[in-house]
Amino acid sequence: MSSVLKEKYNKEVITAMRERFGYSNIMAVPRIQKVVVNTGTGRLVRDKGNDEEVVKYLTAITGQKPIACAARKSIASFKTRLGQIIGYKATIRGERMYDFLTRFITASVPRMRDFRGFDEKAVDAGGNFTMGIREHIIFPETISEDVRMIFGLEVTVVSNAKTREEALVLYRLMGFPLKKM
């Protein structure tokens, strides 16, 4: 079963990108390679039990278990120690990636408070699109009555676009709500 977004890419985006940029080969058309969802636990970790809660929600959101990210060195002002868990991340590829992006664009983004579209500045020169989400509860998978805490996420969409312009066109054609500049 193919994702709606993957079908859209194969049927509409490839032909539109080939017409606009003049690619002679289909494989030269930029595509989304992976999505990385990560969160820094920071002060949440000081309370025991919050780690499991963060892992539970990230697993529900991404569809796979996130890996723990440990501090590489101790920093006294941040109250972190070497090896202490300071965040979690999940890298999503393939069919799961397209399913996540479909749910994200159609269900989660419209639930964001005061959302007017993502800024074009969120796309870097390498064609990667990074957006910060203040509340994890915008995802339909996290809806429940027993939400004890709210944490933010960072979603990075990695593409193999060679230029920023190619990436912006790709994301617009894929249905990402970008602001007009």
Describe the role of every protein-language-model region.
Residues M1-M181:
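Ribosome-associated RNA-binding proteins
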